[in-house]
Regions:
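Short, C-terminally biased terminal segments at protein or domain edges
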Residues: 1-117
C-alpha cells in the first residue's frame, strides 16, 4: 500500500470518528470518552500527514509508529464505548474493522521502512 492510500484511509476514519462523536455528544455520552476518541482517532491521520515532511527515514518511521499507537488507543476507546452500550454493535464493528485495516497497513509500512535503514 502506498502512503497516499494510508493518508486517504486515515482521513476517512477520522471523519467517521468525528461523525460518531457528534452523535455521542448529542446523547450526552461522557465527554472525556468522546474527547479521547476524537483526539486519538484524528491523530492517526495527522501523524501520517506529518510524516510527509519528516527530516529523514527515522523521523518518518517515528511518525508512523506514533500513528500506530494512536490507532491502538482508538480501538480501546471504541471497545469501551461498545461494552458500555454507548455505540451499536454495527457501528463498533465498522469502525473497528477500519482501525484494524489501518493498523495492518501501518505495521507493514514500518517493517518495510526499518528494513531500508
Amino acid at each position: 500500500m502506498t502512503e497516499s492510500v494510508l493518508r486517504t484511509k486515515s482521513k476517512e476514519y477520522a471523519k467517521n470518528i468525528i461523525f460518531l462523536c457528534r452523535e455521542l455528544k448529542a446523547k450526552h455520552t461522557e465527554a472525556t470518552l468522546v474527547n479521547q476518541l476524537i483526539r486519538c482517532g484524528s491523530s492517526i491521520g495527522a501523524n501520517i500527514h506529518e510524516a510527509r515532511y519528516a527530516q529523514g527515514t527515522k523521523d518518518f518511521i517515528s511518525k508512523f509508529e506514533i500513528a500506530l499507537k494512536e490507532c491502538n488507543e482508538s480501538e480501546y476507546w471504541l471497545e469501551l464505548l461498545y461494552e458500555t452500550n454507548c455505540i451499536s454493535e454495527e457501528e463498533f464493528h465498522k469502525l473497528q474493522n477500519n482501525c484494524v485495516e489501518l493498523r495492518r497497513m501501518l505495521v507493514s509500512s514500518v517493517k518495510t521502512l526499518k528494513k531500508q535503514l
